[in-house]
């Protein structure tokens, strides 16, 4: 790293002392890739996949392959992708949900490693109100249908404060299809809670899909 630093000689010496004294250490991509021609120095690239086949295949798969090729770690939100059973107007069919696409992403990480230095690294995020959340939480299990498993990537569940309140009160929680609640993913705090309650009322009235289950069992 020192050989590719720019600036005064004093700055280079100060940085070297930090490294030598083990008071500071750069991320793995920086250590691996400094002074190389193409590889990335950032630990992770964040992205969001929208609810369209174009976004899923281009942003969620193809572009991630290029970033992984040059040693970039990946972290992305897949909440906007509609859940299993959702109606697809363009084909008059039903969605298979987010899980099969995450399986593709997992295999892409295996196929395109980080510049041959280490395996691809990625993490997919899903919010707790998404209809596929239970299958999502099973993705890394060693049992079950391997076509619905992703052993080579990490998963993370975004949990809103409202879910914790419902859990503490032993109340119910409602799952939605993300294409029917398109703004929920962009809200947080009191704005999220207000909108979530509104969508629950719509689900009770049969205006949108809603699956109710205990917040804690």
Q: Residue spans of the language-model regions?
A:
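Active-site cavity-forming subdomains of large catalytic enzyme subunits
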Residues: 42-217
